[in-house]
UniProtKB/Swiss-Prot annotation:
GO terms for biological process: peptide biosynthetic process. GO terms for cellular component: cytoplasm. Transmembrane segments: none annotated. It comes from the Bacteria. The gene is efp. Keywords: Cytoplasm, Elongation factor, Protein biosynthesis. GO terms for molecular function: translation elongation factor activity. Involved in peptide bond synthesis. Stimulates efficient translation and peptide-bond synthesis on native or reconstituted 70S ribosomes in vitro. Probably functions indirectly by altering the affinity of the ribosome for aminoacyl-tRNA, thus increasing their reactivity as acceptors for peptidyl transferase. Belongs to the elongation factor P family. The lineage of its organism: Bacteria, Pseudomonadati, Pseudomonadota, Gammaproteobacteria, Pseudomonadales. This is Elongation factor P.
Length: 189
């Protein structure tokens, strides 16, 4: 059992026998009212999304999910096929099922992912917390602007855009933190 104040992004809870993924959780406490947790939830079976408010002391059933290592095998339109690294079983997911990691999924990637199962059914895939990708396009460095942390926009091979350090050039390999939507960590070593 979890309480409302323990909810955080990535937590899975059970509502009406369905697993719901907490995508966003915001704790609010005002002077007069009791503490509440505002959440954005996604049903892992149907993909339905909703916003719900829980009291800080509300009791919620947490869900234990099975996890297996998998790699991306191939992409066909909006269908992504992953292969279990131990028994080579193939699993297929739609783009909506993996929309949180979709900006960092690309053909030919070698990252070992975690396939997430609920009662034997594949419901999502999680990437490692740090991945390495190649910068496909970025502007040149801005001369003279060296005060503080200078960032500029860059585009990856699959079209994903993010901010990178000013010294990064086209073709450089960069590390990306995949939590919270993905952010630049540094140049890959």
């Amino acid at each position: 059992m979890k309480t409302g104040k323990e909810l955080k992004p990535g937590t899975v809870i059970r509502i009406d026998n369905d697993p719901w993924l907490v995508q966003k959780a915001e704790f609010t406490k005002s002077g007069r009212n009791s503490a509440i947790m505002k959440t954005k939830l996604k049903n892992l079976l149907t993909g339905y999304k909703t916003e719900t408010v829980y009291g800080a002391d509300d009791k919620l059933d947490d869900v234990i999910l099975d996890r297996k290592e998998a790699t991306l095998s191939f992409i066909s339109g909006d269908s992504y096929t992953f292969m279990d690294t131990t028994d080579y079983t193939m699993y297929e997911l739609n783009a909506e099922d993996i929309e949180s990691v979709l900006p960092f999924v690309e053909e030919g990637m070698t990252d070992v992912c975690e396939a997430v199962f609920f009662e034997g059914r594949l419901v999502s895939v999680e990437l490692p917390t740090t991945i390495v990708r190649q910068v496909d396009y970025t502007e040149g460095s801005a001369r003279g602007d060296t005060s503080g942390k200078v960032m500029k926009p860059a585009k990856l091979k699959n079209g994903t855009e993010l901010s990178v350090a000013d010294f990064i050039e086209i073709g450089d390999m960069i590390e990306i933190d995949t939590r919270e939507g993905g952010s630049y960590k540094g140049r890959a070593k």
